[in-house]
Amino acid sequence: MKRMSLIYILFAALVISSCNIIEPDNDPVTYGESYIPNLLSTDKAAYKPGEKVTLSLNSMPEGSVTVRYTHLGKILKQEPLSSSRWTWQPPAEDFQGYMVELHKNVNGRDEVISSVGIDVSSEPSRFPRNGFLSTYGKMSASDIANVLNDLNRYHINYVQFQDWHWKHHHPLAGSATQPMDVWTDIISRNCYRSTVQGYIDGAHKRGMVTLFYNLGYGCLEDYATDDVNPEWLMYTDKLHTHVDNHPLGSPFKSAIYLTDLHNDGWRDYLRARNDEVYSVFNFDGWQIDQLGVRPTTVYDYSGNVIDVQSAFGSFIANEKTAQPNKRIVMNAVGQYGQQGQIASAPVDFCYTEVWEHSNTDGYGIFSRIITDNANWSNGKQTVLAAYLNYDLGLKGRGYFNTPGIIMATAAASAWGGTILQMGEHMLCHEYFPDDNLTMTGELKRAMIRYYDFAVAYENLLRPATPAGGINSDWYGVDVTSTSDYVFNQWGPKANQIATIGRHLDDCDVIHLLSYRNATHLDWCDSDGDQAPQSLVKDIPVSFAVSAQPSRVWVATPDYQQGAAQEVAWEYAGGQLTLTVPAIQYWTMIVVEK
């Protein structure tokens, strides 16, 4: 949670003028032009080894179609398509990504008309893909299923329940023995226990982990009536006269008054409140929020200066000890507290809320965060809370800019990360219920392909720690071409195609990320003016490899539904030459040893 400005508070007052304005029947992801014919889906976001996969089509394609089951470009099995619903038993090996493809002969040419990724993993933190929920009004079972089915199609395996709680210092409404059926959240929206529980049950059915959201060190203005001791609070003066707070205006019910996370009394109090949550709702864990760097020096009740971030590591460790079977994720706002605290604590993965953005550093901010997190955490994965088209969303209702979203998603994915994007709507602001921007049908189709691609090739994009140590597998690769296109080693440059190399045990992976037509190089695309990248085909490229390969193939989420295409190649004098079938936003070349 960033320090929300008064400008946004005034904006929220206009947008959220009634307690239940954001409802699932206004969901921009599900309806309208976003219908996709021949959409291939699975019954779960992820599967345990040994589980069968149920596949389904929303409409049957005409003519003869072949189902092909693949792993990293190799065909495991293929069979004629005979039904709109069927099952497949993946291999038993753990932590593997697969792609199921539908092939059809179109005018004498093999075309992939649909595909879907499949993640087989016993532990979700190996390949985390975060989504969110933010509205808990009265909902039918079918409404809940519709939202979760959308998240399932993006293979979301962690769902964080934003703004579900009653009070920051008392998240469960009522008591463990008498929980409320209906309560109001921080902005006075009605939340229903049946909806929260329905979402938890539905998420579990789809193989998703559920995390309840709450700030780790905050309370509302009525904290004294709930036995919060003033000695547990954080102050802006040494005489404990002024409580530090996160100001929120109307329509929010209260400012958030901040507590001292070092204080054992506060820790014990909040742990007891969390135990109440777990006794009523079978959440799988807690997504802990923070507020980043405080704008002024803060003190404890005795007048001692508080270093807020230095409490994060021990706080997380204590929470894990108290509830060892529950998962923990903690937000690092602008990386505050990540190094030496959060990253090395018992969190499932590193979660960074990204606020730094510029045309100068651009997409390189993502690569720096992801590699830093890997170093600081001994190889944990990274999820980025990166709010795209931010200023565009503040202007009011509108549409996401598809090229900007794709280019940010491609950069994060190529570097082994993922962006928190999908919920009842796509995310554009740190106040998660804000649904000002709508996905176009084009963007929804693209995001499905990109999430499928990230899952199908997860073993190449998010591999296990290399023998040489964390981040030792990345390398610079110089790509040349006899075409008019210019390639450069990462970071991105305008009018060029950036390259990233990665040495894996049995192959080298070369990523090509196109900025040929880029309006700018700012990942946020805050005003929504990033230009689309044109699709170009048959680009000859050459680059150095350490030895003659055994096989070379290419895949991109922008062409042939992400399916791998084996290509012809020539090797001479340490140089590999091949023709890349297509480049639009992101293409991956795999050179098998």
Listing of model-derived features with the role each one plays in the protein:
Residues 113-167:
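An acidic-aromatic substrate-binding cleft motif
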Residues 572-593:
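C-terminal beta-strand-rich structural cap/linker in extracellular carbohydrate-active enzymes
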Residues 122-128, 136-141, 212, 216-281:
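Active-site-adjacent "subsite" loops/lids of carbohydrate-active enzymes
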Residues 15-36:
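Bacterial Sec-dependent N-terminal signal peptides
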Residues 380-473:
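Aromatic/acidic polysaccharide-binding cleft in carbohydrate-active enzymes
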Residues 262-349, 355-367:
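Active-site neighborhood of glycoside hydrolase catalytic domains
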Residues 481-547, 587:
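Carbohydrate-binding surface patches
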Residues 147-148, 152-194, 218-233, 259-262, ...:
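Aromatic-lined carbohydrate-binding/catalytic grooves of carbohydrate-active enzymes
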